[in-house]
Amino acid sequence: RCRATCILVDIGGEDKVQYIAKVLKDDTNELVRHEAAFSLGQMCYSNGIVPLEDATKNDPSMFVRHEAAIALGVMGSKKVRETLENALNDPDKPVRDSAVVALSNLEFMEKLSKNEKFAKLTGG
């Protein structure tokens, strides 16, 4: 199932997000769900945000919550700030630490996007 998730990422396309999100939500194996969270972060499609937020808040595995928080930070969307701030209160330290890293990444991306030279180079 991990390999299948990776193959979907390699094939690419926003239409694959729904399938990876289903794996993140429903798979019984925390390693597979962790891989799905990582994959959604790497894909960086906005329709991956809600499944990652849900996993950050609700997955029973600290391992998955940690990866979902990191993935949200990688995506760099301001929309996830509240979810990450709430994750600072997670009962597990690795999740709290991941939220700190993710929030730092959001701040970095925000500052970078305000840089005129960077904006010209990236078309934004």
Q: In which residue ranges do the predicted regions lie?
A:
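TPR/TPR-like alpha-solenoid helical repeat scaffolds
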Residues: 99-108
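Amphipathic alpha-helical scaffolding segments comprising HEAT/armadillo-like alpha-solenoid repeats
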Residues: 13-25, 45-57, 77-89, 108-122
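Long, ordered, amphipathic alpha-helical scaffolds
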Residues: 73, 78, 97-100
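Acidic (E/D-rich), amphipathic helical modules within compact regulatory domains
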Residues: 2-10, 22, 28-35
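Short inter-helical turns and helix N-cap capping residues of alpha-solenoid HEAT/ARM repeat scaffolds
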Residues: 28-29, 60-61, 91-92
